[in-house]
Amino acid sequence: LKSGRRIPADLAVIAIGVRPHVDWLRSSGIEINRGIVVDEFQESSCPDIYAAGDVAETRHLLTGERSVVAIWPEAVNQGRVAGWNMSGRVVSYPGSLPMNAVEIGEKALVSAGIVNPTDDNCEIIIKKDRENYKKLVIKDDCIIGVIFIGDIEKSGIYINLMRQKLPVQAFYEKLLEPNFGLINLPTQYRKHF
């Protein structure tokens, strides 16, 4: 580490992320921060100029803060919204949700949302065994963070609950049970899946 401290490990995974290539636009009149700043319609500060994907700086779905979330699913969603708005159909983008899915060795890993909250009002639920690790971060009765290592099969359910900001109180006790699935969700929630 910078401090000179050493941390022994069998494996270290380091990722530096993505930095949008936007320097060439700085004198264009388009508002640039870390990326091209866009509104909820993916429109830049210059009327009729839209941005999406790795160069777009959007609102974070959960915090509302501006950020660049350079991942394929968000690029697709942003591109759709930008395209609809360019064609005259008014559609707003709900915000970006950071997430990753990787395989390290033979272990699958999915993380999404706010996985290491600094807010004391968050509840963290962890269920683990020798092969699997599952962590949910809950705030105000909604999932705001997910980490699954090993068995990631149903992680999409949790990520969609988070994306839709659906309260989990009605099925809270079953959240990390092995047989948890769509059947455990209230009927009115299932339309979101």
PLM regions with names:
Residues 1-5, 149:
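Secondary-structure transition/turn motif
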Residues 2-3, 40, 138-142:
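Short acidic-glycine loop/turn motifs at beta-strand connectors
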Residues 5-84, 170-176:
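FAD-site-proximal beta/loop scaffold in flavoenzymes
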Residues 26, 120-121, 158:
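Extended hydrophobic-aromatic, low-complexity segments
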Residues 55-154:
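Mid-to-C-terminal Rossmann-like scaffold of FAD/NAD(P)H-dependent oxidoreductases
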Residues 78, 85, 181-193:
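An exposure/low-complexity boundary signal
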Residues 129-189:
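C-terminal auxiliary extensions adjacent to catalytic cores
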